[in-house]
């Protein structure tokens, strides 16, 4: 008996500067539920992230399904079809609308990505979507919150106090957010406010208003020659914690210059080369949101290779509950969205747009055809 198949966006071996190595495959395998903690989700909508085009370009794995962010409906909660006997089924029964994120860009799990009709996810890292949130809004959250959760709550990263629903920080300490107008930046600003911190955003002049709308207490323009002095003045006290949502030579230089003279922690969302680490006293943490999954990611001699860490997964599970509570209470809002019509092909076209730098201040989202 043949295995069930689905439509999905998969990687190809074709390399071209003009087009990403992706195609629509209408005979991709449907992933199987792996444990009592996992559920099968029918995908309703997906969001596109820069790592989706970066990973298929630099770590190409032909025939592997792509995609991280999603919103969908639980359709199976154990190996026994629609059984509700598992721990996952008890928490998220069949028919529940959920959102979350995967990391399909590793050889260990090539048949499980969000750019597909179905995906398998650990239910402990899923968020139940309230009626007040649309499929597209919910699809935009997974990668963002999982990454921010580790940047904030991992003691080896920023190690912030408390949680959004249980704030314990009282000093209103400034936290610098470089890239405050990005999807990660606007989410970080919202969560920092809820946790009792004071987010100061670095953004372009065009994105300044957006960052302020999402909770930044003040902004500085990264193109200004006075950017660092402005940031220090806005903070009013030494900055000891910085989140860099961009992570390139320019952003690292500004962040390092803005950091307190005595010490501080710099959490970045991409690799920070040694050449950018100009002050040894500053602690650096390259945050990879996929570590909330608690599994090994093996991508050769790169910063993306990480061993599974159950402590980081525990942070992710805790934050999944936090995000759900914030969504239900109306304390969280999605980054501005731009829906791309066209289904499967729109996903590939949208990733090309991201690669070419054609998207600013918006998160690209696509509805998955319900064939």
Curated annotation (Swiss-Prot):
According to its UniProt record, what is one Pfam family this protein matches?
Answer: ADH_N
Provide this UniProt record's keywords sorted from A to Z: NADP, Nucleotide-binding, Oxidoreductase
Biotechnology usage: Calbistrin A has been reported to possess a number of interesting bioactivities including antifungal active against Candida albicans and cytotoxic toward both healthy and leukemic human cells.
Listed pathway(s): Secondary metabolite biosynthesis
Per the UniProt entry, the Enzyme Commission number(s) are: 1.-.-.-
Residues holding NADP(+)? 51-54, 181-184, 204-207, 222, 269-270, 359-360
Does the record carry Cytoplasm as a key word?
no
- What switches on its expression? Expression is induced in complex medium (Czapek yeast autolysate medium) supporting calbistrin production.
What Gene Ontology molecular-function terms does this entry list? nucleotide binding; oxidoreductase activity, acting on NAD(P)H
Binding residues annotated for substrate, in chain numbering: 145-152, 289-293
- Quaternary structure and interacting proteins, as annotated: Monomer.
**Known role:** Trans-enoyl reductase; part of the gene cluster that mediates the biosynthesis of calbistrin A and related compounds. Calbistrin A is a secondary metabolite with an interesting structure that was recently found to have bioactivity against leukemia cells. It consists of two polyketides linked by an ester bond: a bicyclic decalin containing polyketide and a linear 12 carbon dioic acid structure. The polyketide synthase calA is probably responsible for forming the decalin moiety.
Family assignment from sequence similarity? Belongs to the zinc-containing alcohol dehydrogenase family.
For this entry, the protein name equals: Trans-enoyl reductase calK
Which organism's genome codes for this protein? Penicillium decumbens
